[in-house]
Amino acid sequence: LLCFYEFYNLINKIYKNIIFKTIVFFFIVLYLYFFYSLLIRLRIEFGEEVILILLISCIFSDIGGYVVGKLIGGPKLTSISPNKTISGALGSIIFTVIGTSSFALFLNKVDEGLIKLEFSFIIFIWLIIMSIFCQFGDLIVSYLKRKANVKDTGNLLPGHGGILDRVDG
């Protein structure tokens, strides 16, 4: 909930149109409703594991992009966020696929048969898509921060840019 508060504050700094801000607020409420509805539905069978794997894939995406981008560097990905590189984007995808797959296999070994997750081509594609969406989320928040002329979205996590920066993927 705190990240949505930070997101709405960011929008308030950029846009002055009350109608636009109302529409954004409506979509935040709608998103929260569907997100929590999904959580309730996922609790039926293996929902916690699915949510955990989604969160882990976003974490691996962020870590992979940062580590590979810093180590290899190379051409910039976009002017929206000048520290993002093409090598970082590829590292993000690789870390997501390898890290999340390893975590899911570990989770399956720890809790025998808890999730029937067999690594397949479809899961491979889904992990790539997850990484790409995580990177887009990061770029969108970077764009909004640049437009609002702020470095961090909040101060609850010093050095991390705020809650929104941690979960933007």
For the regions a language model picked out, list residue spans one by one.
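Membrane-embedded alpha-helical bundles of polytopic integral membrane proteins
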Residues: 1-128, 132
